[in-house]
Amino acid sequence: MSDLREINRLNKDEEFEYFKLYSNSNGFRKWNLDEHNIFSKASLEYNFLKPDQMIEILKLVNQHNSNTSCKARTLEELNIHIKVYQNFLNKQQALRSPTTGSLNISGFGNPITSGGGGLGVLGGGGGGGGISSSSLGGLSGSGLFLNTMVNNTFQTILDSLDGNSSNNNNNNIPSTSSVKDVVSIGINPLFQKSVQSQSQLPTATNNNNKQPLELISKPIPTATATATTTATTTTTTIQPPIGGTKNTVNKEIEQDSNDNDNNNNTNNNNNNNNNNNNNNNNEEKEKQYLNYINNSLGELNKKDLKLLNEPWTVEDQKKLEDALTKYPPSRFSSVSRWQMVSKELGISPKAVALRYNQMLNQLIPKKPSLQQQQQQQQQQQQQPTTTTTTTTKPEQSIKSEEEEQTTGKRKSRSSFSSPSSSSKESPNKKEKTTHDTTTTTNTATTTTVTPNMTTPSIINSSPAIAANLLEADSLLQKNNQLLKQIRTSVMQLTDPQSTILTEVIENINNSIQLTGKWKDNIEMPPLPLKVNDLILSLISNNTSSSFKKPLSKKVTEWNLVVEDDAPTQDKK
């Protein structure tokens, strides 16, 4: 029967188990000594693996509680009590001696013995069945633990394999008819793993010193079986006969020499092939590396693409840039920075990081691939020199250039007419205004070089266009000075001169003509937009909000009306 020490120990362990499971011990209720004794007796009669028998044990415990006017136990409380009681028995089993029935480490505690219908801790001194710590000699704690583990788990197997072993070895093994074994077998399914690991150990029967049937009929695991079979198949080789005639030996020597020659030739060929393959592999690696550099972001997964495919406007991009400047990387870490920006924009931090990487990817120029570089080298070798020719373009080409300037679209070169067909046209069609003649003279001087899709356009690098851009810039600087004069006159409440406005408009038209030669961009060049900002700043203080709209990219749509308020000044 259990005593107060054992039940106090169990109650403390069970209270700690409640704290681990539920983070508090509010649902814990202590077990008294009579209640635990009834539970230990019921563990001998019923099996915990079967739910119906577990309910019977619970009924016996609750029947005692009803007789003593105590609160009934639940099935969950019984499960936790079983778990705690099993751990307690396992600890006591580890303290048992491998040579005697029990072991007392403390020297005065209570050894575990079997009897009295249940397993309990009996009161008594260190004498009798108990062994004091002084009798252990030089055994340390770790040595005692290993000794106990070996004897409890492998002693039966060693005895069954040893042919000279007798029943004397088995007499030293402690009795297995204790309640601990009964409880470990009849345990709740929640704790079935530890029971299976203990119950799967083979039991030795030493009748007539024969090996048990379990060891003989134990199957080989599949992994070890396949390993042994493969090893036997690889090691079995057919050997030639030991003895042989001289002719056969000579023939074998000749065959060996021929085989060696053939092998040398094949080895040389294989070496050459390997060198070629290595070169090809190096080229492929270079291609892969260049492709990886070109695709700096790499392949995105489906989730990232889904985030990037969400609607994203110019205002959102501006908000993102403002938020990035508001939360600089010098003051925020990457994680906290994305979190703060995501709060500003109302999107997830991952989406912010993807948009930021997308911005960086647009800023980084992509390098040409290896194939494009090879094509450029071949074209440069075929046509190493560049020639400058001044030719008069046909009428249709001039029209196509004018259409490109107005619409921003290109036409294929096949649409251009040949010189012979253009010469047959009437001379009336070839007559042009001064505006057309100026455009033809500007576009007549061209440089013919090898076509290259990856390099920038020729127009951007030609000296004529550079001169045009410089002239357009000078016109815009003049406009800035003229607009300053208009601003000062408006601030002084005086009417500005009409000649200044006409000069501003003429300068704008000339700058558009000069910068309209850009073929790569459909949009208007960025230089005249300075004028747009200046004019908007002038009219913003004197006009209504309905008129405060961005100016059109075409000057003809600006609708600037110039009134001749001072004709005398024009005459002067």
Swiss-Prot record:
Query: What are the residue boundaries of the Myb-like domain, all occurrences included?
Result: 311-360
InterPro entries recorded: Homeodomain-like_sf, SANT/Myb, ZZZ3
Q: Which Gene3D superfamilies match?
A: Homeodomain-like
S-S bonds? none
Residues covered by region (Disordered):
196-283, 367-456
Q: Where is the composition biased (Low complexity)?
A: 222-237, 260-281, 371-392, 414-425, 436-455
Domain of life of the native organism: Eukaryota
- Where composition is biased (Basic and acidic residues), the residues are 426-435
In terms of SMART domains, this protein maps to: SANT
* Biased composition range(s): Polar residues: 196-211
Protein known as: Myb-like protein Y
